């Protein structure tokens, strides 16, 4: 039985050092619980709605330095977290350093690389560009990266093999919108499901809107029941401002079984830490 801890931390937008302090505490708490793995939300180190901070090189270098700190803290536990990845050798459309909305994993004090991966992180595939979301303004998607590398998305989107004690879990790591694929021409979940994965892990920075959680339960329940793969969903909480509107993030971390049934859900806007027991055959 694999113990997977989650933490829906109260992310402070733009304050990497304070977010690191929270993350460091959660790593220690997960150790004390005997967890094999800790899963944290999307953009938990930097915040999500931080506007043109994404264009400040000093901020990006600080982000890189603290990603290294998280990796170093994984000496006896696997850690999966959402953060910004930077490729200083490439640029985006505005000639600024290329950035990815990414998921990192580390174990034994070192970064892990997805199966057949070209980077030591997972790149978000579907970048939202509506309401409060500005992903396409700042980040490069896996779709664009694959196109430039001459790869199909099926080749570029690969499982993450994550150590968990004496076992290894073959996971499909998703970043928020990657599971909200109803209005897209492709489904990252469907692609990963064909690659013999045992568990989906969705790292999210999903603001609260009325009825959104109910829609997520319906949407994921339908998708997972068809793919026959369970999921753990981890969302951040707190308050963030995109310069136009303030948005609350309610957490509501959840687990779904392979039938798509919601089997556990954290309380909204609170600090509950969940410990899920996962068995690949159940």
Give each language-model segment a name.
Residues 1-282:
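Enzyme catalytic cores with a strong preference for nitrogen-chemistry domains
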